[in-house]
């Protein structure tokens, strides 16, 4: 691939607007069913991966290196959703807000009731008193 082609491909990268365009341009194989279900999550993860990359200014002279980094970031983002679900990653606020809370129970709150330790008449009386 020539430097001109790399520069053109980098310019095309900046014009991409769909997940499929990114996959096609960066030549990443994908399952359309996975993308259909996780499109926004993959793109959000991809944006986060791109943000972690070093500043592009240093690589502007080497678009091939930059495109390689972008491809690796897209592969990581796609694989994140082939190995786990959107609920596992919780990238969006609506999912983060609904994250399950840990159910911590201190040991002092745990009690053990033994079967047959109460008399049936006592249990009946307690039930009637509760009404």
UniProtKB/Swiss-Prot annotation:
Give the record's keywords alphabetically.
Nitrogen fixation
Quote the Pfam families the UniProt record gives: NifW (PF03206)
GO biological process terms, semicolon-separated: nitrogen fixation
What exactly does this protein do?
A: May protect the nitrogenase Fe-Mo protein from oxidative damage.
Q: Which family does it belong to?
A: Belongs to the NifW family.
- Subunit structure comment from the entry: Homotrimer; associates with NifD.
Query: What protein name applies here?
Result: Nitrogenase-stabilizing/protective protein NifW
